[in-house]
Regions:
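N-terminal leader/auxiliary helical segments
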Residues: 1-205
Length: 205
């Protein structure tokens, strides 16, 4: 799954392409990770369901069944973009970097990849010339899949992501290719825009 800064990169580009001037778009882009402490909370917030082969994937259709009538709201559009991006993370990143590995090597690669996120934060902020959008939690949400206390925590983590570690800024990536990450982000933006345009045509938002 992509990092907070990656999701923010996506919603920043969506805001420009869709002409959305609302912090709620960015808040929605982070919201799926505002989960509770139980084991199933991430599956619920990411609309993850088992496939016929027993493996789990994000079910975008399930999200639209539940919230499709609210897709005029920037928050829900941002939320949807997060799900699209996480869905594509498997196809664009997991298949290349993790699937060929043994379970032991995969665990090692996951740790290295997590450390790469700190380096990627600095690289992406610089590459896209990102500035921090001040986010505030919403008082309440009709989404019972979001933990509002956890959402405040996600916002604080997002704010901390903009505090660049000089060491990380000058460090090379150990696992990911920066070009692959940029390609993944571009694919996520294009796919989200395409799906939102399709929803617009169907519902005439």
């Amino acid at each position: 799954m992509g990092s907070r800064i990656m999701h923010y990169c996506i919603t920043v580009q969506l805001a420009e392409k869709l002409k959305i001037n609302s912090e709620l778009l960015h808040l929605g882009g982070l919201a799926p990770d505002a989960i509770g402490s139980d084991d199933q909370s991430k599956d619920r917030s990411h609309f993850i369901t088992p496939k016929e082969n027993g493996k789990k994937r994000i079910n975008l259709g399930l999200f639209l069944e539940k919230y499709g009538d609210r897709m005029h709201d920037p928050f829900y559009r941002g939320f949807f973009s997060h799900l699209v991006a996480d869905y594509l993370w498997y196809d664009c990143i997991m298949v290349k970097y993790f699937k060929p590995l043994s379970m032991e090597d995969r665990r090692k690669a996951e740790k290295i990849g997590y450390l790469d996120f700190r380096i990627l934060n600095a690289k992406l902020i610089d590459h896209f010339n990102l500035t921090e959008c001040k986010l505030t939690t919403i008082e309440q949400s009709e989404m019972d899949i979001i933990d509002m206390h956890a959402l405040s925590g996600v916002i604080h983590q997002y704010e901390a992501d903009f505090i660049i570690d000089p060491i990380a800024e000058s460090s090379p990536l150990r696992l990911y290719s920066f070009e692959d990450i940029l390609s993944y982000l571009d694919c996520s933006v294009k796919e989200t825009v395409s799906r939102l345009e399709e929803i617009n045509r169907e519902t005439k938002i």
